[in-house]
């Protein structure tokens, strides 16, 4: 309890937690029902849904390298986060007046345009939000995992609300996402503890400040891929997270909702289930850093693998 109160006394922790909470809430309010929306409201087949997700992932993969390079040059500045928030505000108008008509007139053109927007505003933006939060945690004396956990909490609350909004009017989930993004932009612009010299002097870790002042060269970035340990981690992520994500996002929602008498009942139940799952994720993200310090990173990963195998 003492550690939690100490964390909340840190303005950098409070601001970073709120920003990442709003990002995941604004994304989760519609993303948690994206597959259901595509199949039940737009009538697309599983193959078409897979195509839409694949296009989005492909564009996001390219953008992640671009975004990563840009953020390295910006350092702690939140310029890109503000840009993402502006793009996210457009999610309601985009889905209502652009995406649906384009998919109806030409599926592949609509899928490509949608992939670009989703990657720019959400899919490739997510790692940037997480990376900035992680950098801030090292520089301003707070635990990254405990700040990132608030993102899962925001997603959990959003998923719970989405189930009820979706059954009322599917478009509500997108427009609510726009509203949350607008609040996020206000927070990004107005809450800037890093501009307060007294707060910076109190919480800044000087050694991390010196590290941040050095921007890695292109050669240093490429040099990372020569490390065997990096490739081990890449293979691990591909063989675990990728398969889980495809099942979780594209297959499970439709599978689960079939067990209910009406589509509406299934959609509401899925929203509740998804919310509970992400809320447990929120709790674990606060506890895992403590566990990792006790047993080590390697053993923590092996424990995670054992749980996934079950």
Model regions and ranges:
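Juxtamembrane intracellular "pre-TM" segments in multi-pass secondary transporters
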Residues: 1-11, 192-234, 258-262
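Helix-loop boundary and gating motifs at the non-cytosolic
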Residues: 2-61, 229-237, 241-261, 266-273
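Glycine-rich segments within core transmembrane alpha-helices of 12-TM secondary carriers
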Residues: 60-61, 141-163
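Helix-to-loop junctions at the C-terminal end of transmembrane segments
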Residues: 62-76, 165-166, 283-297
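Primarily marks hydrophobic transmembrane alpha-helices of the MFS/SLC 12-helix fold
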Residues: 80-81, 301
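C-terminal ends and interior cores of transmembrane alpha-helices
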Residues: 86-105, 307-310
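Cytoplasmic helix-loop-helix junction between adjacent transmembrane helices
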Residues: 114-151
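Symmetry-related core transmembrane helices of the 12-TM Major Facilitator Superfamily/SLC fold
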Residues: 158, 173-190
């Amino acid at each position: 309890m003492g550690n939690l109160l100490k964390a909340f006394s840190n303005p950098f922790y409070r601001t970073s937690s709120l920003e990442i909470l709003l990002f995941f809430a604004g994304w989760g309010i519609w993303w948690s029902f994206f597959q259901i929306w595509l199949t039940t409201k737009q009538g697309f087949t599983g193959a078409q849904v897979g195509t839409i997700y694949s296009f989005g992932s492909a564009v996001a993969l390219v953008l992640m390298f671009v975004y990563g390079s840009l953020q390295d040059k910006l350092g702690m500045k939140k310029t890109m986060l503000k840009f993402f928030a502006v793009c996210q505000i457009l999610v309601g108008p985009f889905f209502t007046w652009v995406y649906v008509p384009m998919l109806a007139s030409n599926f592949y053109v609509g899928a490509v345009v949608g992939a670009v927007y989703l990657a720019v505003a959400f899919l490739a933006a997510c790692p940037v939000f997480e990376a900035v939060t992680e950098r801030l945690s090292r520089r301003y004396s707070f635990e990254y995992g405990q700040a990132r956990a608030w993102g899962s909490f925001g997603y959990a609350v959003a998923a719970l609300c989405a189930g009820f909004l979706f059954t009322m009017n599917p478009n509500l989930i997108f427009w609510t996402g726009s509203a949350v993004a607008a609040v996020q932009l206000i927070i990004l612009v107005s809450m800037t503890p890093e501009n307060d010299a007294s707060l910076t002097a109190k919480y800044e870790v000087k050694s991390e400040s010196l590290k941040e002042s050095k921007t890695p060269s292109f050669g240093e970035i490429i040099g990372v891929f020569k490390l065997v340990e990096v490739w081990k981690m890449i293979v691990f992520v591909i063989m675990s997270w990728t398969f889980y994500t495809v099942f979780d996002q594209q297959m499970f929602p439709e599978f689960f909702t079939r067990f209910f008498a009406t589509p509406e009942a299934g959609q509401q139940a899925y929203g509740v289930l998804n919310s509970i799952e992400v809320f447990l994720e929120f709790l674990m993200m606060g506890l895992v850093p403590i566990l990792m310090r006790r047993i080590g990173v390697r053993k923590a990963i092996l424990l995670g693998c054992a749980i996934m195998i079950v």
